[in-house]
Amino acid sequence: MNEHNLLIFCLKDNVSISEYTEMIDWAYKNIQSETVVEITENQIIEYQNRGLWRLVSEITDNWLFGPSEGDWLIDKESILAVKEKLQNSDFSTEPLVKNIIHVLEYAIKNEKTVIFHF
């Protein structure tokens, strides 16, 4: 697995794509977008071991145990709860988590779905 090919993202406000694979393609083509967070396999494992994904799982009922576990699509109803949970966690000051929170805030403001593509 490529060390830098895992993403947490939402589409930009001016982008309307309904096909899931096209959303993934868009994210890879727009990796520098403010709405795309690139995350390594090692980071996924580290945060799993530290309990970050458990916080998200408690809200979404989608359980992630490590890389290649599949994809999460976080619906609009859960995004606010996930954002608040992360902001109130011990992880909230870490740069990667700050970037994830930014994507969640953007998604809330622009009514977008957030995708965890692991």
Curated annotation (Swiss-Prot):
InterPro entries: DMP12, DMP12_sf
Pfam families linked: DMP12
Stretches that traverse the bilayer: none
Superkingdom of this protein's organism: Bacteria
GO terms assigned for molecular function: metal ion binding
Role description: Acts as a DNA mimic. Interacts with the DNA-binding protein HU and partially prevents the binding of HU protein to DNA by occupying the DNA binding sites on the protein. However, the relatively weak affinity of DMP12 for HU suggests that it may not completely block the HU protein-DNA binding, and that DMP12 is more likely to act as a regulator than a competitive inhibitor. It protects HU protein from limited digestion by trypsin in a limited trypsin digestion assay, suggesting that it may serve to protect the HU protein and improve the stability of unbound HU protein.
Domain remark in the UniProt entry: The shape and electrostatic surface of the DMP12 monomer are similar to those of the straight portion of the bent HU-bound DNA and complementary to those of HU protein dimer.
Subunit annotation: Monomer. Interacts with the dimeric form of the DNA-binding protein HU.
Similarity section: Belongs to the DMP12-like protein family.
Protein name from the UniProt record: DNA mimic protein DMP12
